[in-house]
């Protein structure tokens, strides 16, 4: 299968502050990261699948820009014990990233003389290695309940564990749309998330329209709302 996605975040206007004007200079800057991804996955056997995603990343903060190419890769294996399966994945793997652009070096001290700065330090992308396990304690033609456990090992943060659950209910055999509710919690970061969605198959076609909503409680950023519209085939 082949997939394509476009991601964009609009953070709105951010006040510009300096050492001497901590409440704002009257200027604002915009922050807007976006990504374009192309993925390919293949089922090699009834139990084993693998895939890879190539991503072009663009970020801009005021006059600073950042461009880079990253990729994700993962494998998926069904154990043969009920519906249990596990997966291994690495995300945001790539070379060092370097910002470009020009900023004015303003402030006090010998290193803040108002000169323009156009050379910046390179840094590693936020690589994350994950191992996950999932199964369905309840599954039949009208409903399913999924539970999952995942180990997260990022290169820029402490290792943590994620717990997740999803319950899906089919409306009827005549109208096989699904209503879905989800919940999750990250142990170690004390972050929770929840969401809901509806997936509607198109009659006479092998397409499924998907509409999903999720809420994540990120301590440093507050609540984050995500709305997703998609089509699976």
Task: Name the predicted role of every residue range.
Residues 1-233:
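Subset of outer-membrane beta-barrel
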């Amino acid at each position: 299968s082949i997939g394509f996605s476009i991601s964009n975040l609009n953070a709105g206007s951010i006040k510009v502050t300096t050492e001497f004007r901590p409440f704002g200079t009257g200027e604002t800057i915009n922050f807007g990261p976006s990504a374009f991804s192309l993925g390919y996955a293949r089922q090699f056997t009834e139990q084993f699948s693998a895939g890879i995603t190539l991503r072009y990343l663009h970020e801009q903060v005021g006059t600073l820009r950042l461009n880079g190419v990253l990729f994700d890769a993962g494998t998926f294996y069904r154990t043969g014990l009920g519906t249990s399966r596990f997966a291994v994945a690495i995300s945001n793997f790539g070379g060092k990233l370097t910002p470009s652009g020009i900023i004015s070096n303003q402030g006090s001290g010998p290193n803040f003389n108002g000169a323009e700065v156009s050379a910046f330090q390179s840094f590693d992308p936020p690589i994350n290695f994950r191992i996950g396990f999932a199964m369905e304690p309840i599954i039949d033609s009208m409903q399913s309940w999924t539970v999952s456990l995942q180990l997260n090992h990022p290169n820029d943060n402490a290792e943590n564990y994620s717990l997740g659950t999803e319950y899906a209910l089919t409306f009827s055999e005549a109208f096989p749309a699904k209503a879905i509710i989800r919940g999750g919690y990250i142990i170690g970061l004390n972050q929770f998330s929840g969401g809901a969605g509806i997936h509607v198959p198109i009659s006479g076609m092998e397409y499924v329209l998907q509409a999903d909503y999720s809420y994540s409680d990120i301590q440093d950023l507050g609540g984050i709302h995500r709305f997703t519209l998609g089509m699976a085939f």
